[in-house]
């Protein structure tokens, strides 16, 4: 909270509209992510790297990997965002869930696993992606200065951001080398 007040003071010094400053808070995932991209913006950074507090860097070159393609071009499109992906405690990208009887009828984790196999598990290394993970997103300045996270979205802010970016003509790619260990707390 003290750091947030400093950011608000800096925004006021830069004549940021008070209606925008009122939006600055750290309640909910979307607002926390907005504070991350806003901080990158006011610091003049070319990219924002969004990482969560329950993740571990296992690759020493993670930052180099994350910044390797951002802002470039591939397949005739700008690389405005790069999505990494989570590895669970077992070192794979599948959701670590206990199978419940209802999953027989609504196999969302099975379908998700198939999508991950297709996007994460296959070449090429960099490809356009239909999904992103909020705790493993790299966002170029051209994108984050135009598209914020929707503060009214309480969950799924990462996919919502991807959709909004696409609506504004920006492109998100997934880098199959950009993995990070995700160790969420026990519920």
Describe each model-derived feature in a short phrase.
Residues 142-145:
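Short, well-ordered alpha-helical scaffold segment located
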Residues 168-171, 175-187:
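Active-site donor/metal-binding and catalytic loop motifs
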Residues 77-101:
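Short beta-strand-to-loop element that shapes/binds the nucleotide-sugar donor at the catalytic cleft/hinge
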Residues 1-39, 43:
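Active-site-proximal specificity loops/subdomain of glycosyltransferases
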Residues 154-161:
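Acidic donor-binding loop at a coil-to-helix junction in glycosyltransferase catalytic cores
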Residues 118-138:
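A recurrent flexible, glycine/aromatic-enriched loop bordering the glycosyltransferase active site
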Residues 45-56:
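Short beta-strand-to-loop acidic/aromatic patch adjacent to the donor-nucleotide binding site
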Residues 60-81:
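Conserved donor-nucleotide/metal-binding helix-loop-beta segment in metal-dependent transferases, i.e.
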